[in-house]
């Protein structure tokens, strides 16, 4: 099984989304999943070609950090590229799990935006995670938060491995 992670944040050291996707990646690799990460901020000049990387994945994670408003320009560019250049047949068979952390507010709306976009593209959504984390060091002292993140990764693995069926959305 292969899962691609598309990270739309800025790559700052104190980005809580980085902590979450690192933890998710660790859990998935323990489950013998091949994980490939694409940092969109490093690949700005290649964003239009990135939808082709979905072809080799069984599932993807769209991860973003809300610092002010919305899921960020790089993630929007990636989703636009999926709409314009993506293989719609492959997208229709690909599960997506959103990860959205906020340092201000709006994490729920961000998760909803990613899920809605993926459904409009014809993809299969699966449960994700969102939360408000002002200081990522909170993860070091809270085993319950770590357990939530690990369960999300395990649930994504289970969903993809069992090829769970999704009810059809109205926005396709």
Kindly label every feature range from the protein language model.
Residues 92-144:
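Short, glycine-/small-residue-rich phosphate/pyrophosphate-handling segment
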